[in-house]
């Protein structure tokens, strides 16, 4: 481990809290900031310092950012009260973990470069439960030296980190990842509803699927939601819609047809129109069941989510 560097953390939502908590518990010198200070306060019990204003983080050598949208990223970095508003900015590296567009990431890189700060794009695969299970993974792009400097701290949070090259390549990987997330979830919902309408209990069908060559960490992880209809939010339909839109935008930019992504986006929009954004995107299965003329009921069967040996979105 190199000489410890002071770490700043911006954004204490579901993901940000779990990630910052792992950093603090690993002994990193972490100062956290969140728009609602009360959400960050519990991290003090794990050794983190809680900043009163964003500019306080400008004294940190490395600053992580984990917020919801590109608008939020711009505000916390370059807004009137953002990180760069401090009189003395000592930050040398920003590690930006949010899901944002290629264009937004490139713009952020230029804003930071003008202030002598490097950007490491480092979006993630996983959710808060996956983070707590120690199964998160990073995909990173930017200067190789920045990745090498960040790696010890990334590994405090997650066991896996992949470096894919310079610039904004990690954003493209994350966009592709989340397009796959949406398409796979919709496909899994369709075949599970088909099996049930033919008479196969959902838990039995998914038990087979999870043990087959088609099973995956992700299908196991979503099995409890599909079987017992527990849609406590891990990732909202609106956030998935945002990522599908990013994917479709990228498809247009690079002239790659994405018909399955486009159809999944339309289905997701229909789900959102029914006012389900306070629940998990796995509710796609209920939406599809209604289209098939059946009403799902919880099966109340104990099923494993696979987190003891894996994780998922």
Feature map (PLM): residue ranges:
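Rossmann-fold dinucleotide-binding core
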Residues: 99-182
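NAD(P)+-binding Rossmann beta1-loop-alpha1 motif at the extreme N-terminus of oxidoreductases
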Residues: 1-65, 92, 162, 296
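Rossmann-fold NAD(P) dinucleotide-binding segment
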Residues: 54-118
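Helical "substrate-binding/catalytic lid" subdomain
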Residues: 149, 168-292
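Hydrophobic beta-strand scaffold residues
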Residues: 30, 50, 119-120, 161, ...
């Amino acid at each position: 481990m190199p000489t410890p560097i002071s770490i700043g953390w911006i954004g204490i939502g579901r993901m940000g809290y779990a990630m910052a908590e792992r950093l603090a518990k690993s002994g990193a010198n972490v100062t956290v900031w969140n728009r609602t200070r009360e959400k960050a306060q519990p991290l003090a019990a794990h050794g983190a310092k809680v900043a009163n204003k964003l500019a306080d983080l400008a004294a940190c050598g490395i600053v992580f950012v984990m917020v919801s949208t590109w608008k939020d990223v711009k505000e916390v970095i370059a807004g009137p009260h953002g990180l760069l508003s401090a009189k003395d900015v000592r930050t040398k590296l920003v590690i930006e973990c949010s899901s944002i567009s290629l264009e937004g990431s490139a713009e952020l890189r230029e804003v930071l470069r003008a202030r002598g700060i490097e950007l490491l794009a480092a979006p993630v695969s996983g959710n808060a439960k996956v983070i707590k299970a120690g199964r998160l993974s990073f995909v990173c792009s930017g200067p190789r030296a920045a990745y090498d400097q960040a790696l010890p701290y990334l590994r405090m949070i997650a066991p896996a980190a992949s470096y894919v090259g310079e610039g904004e390549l990690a954003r493209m990987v994350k966009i592709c990842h989340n397009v796959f997330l949406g398409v796979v979830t919709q496909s899994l919902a369709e075949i599970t509803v088909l099996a049930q309408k033919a008479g196969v209990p959902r838990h039995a069908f998914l038990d087979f699927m999870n043990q087959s060559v088609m099973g995956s960490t992700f299908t196991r992880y979503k099995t409890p939601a599909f079987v017992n209809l527990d849609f406590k939010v891990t990732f909202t339909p609106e956030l998935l819609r945002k990522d599908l839109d990013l994917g479709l935008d990228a498809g247009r930019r690079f002239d790659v047809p994405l018909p399955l992504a486009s159809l999944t986006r339309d289905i997701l929009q229909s789900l959102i129109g029914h006012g389900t954004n306070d629940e998990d995107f796995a509710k796609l299965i209920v939406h599809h069941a209604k289209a098939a003329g059946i009403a799902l009921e919880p099966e109340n069967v104990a099923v494993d989510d696979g987190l003891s040996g894996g994780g998922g979105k």
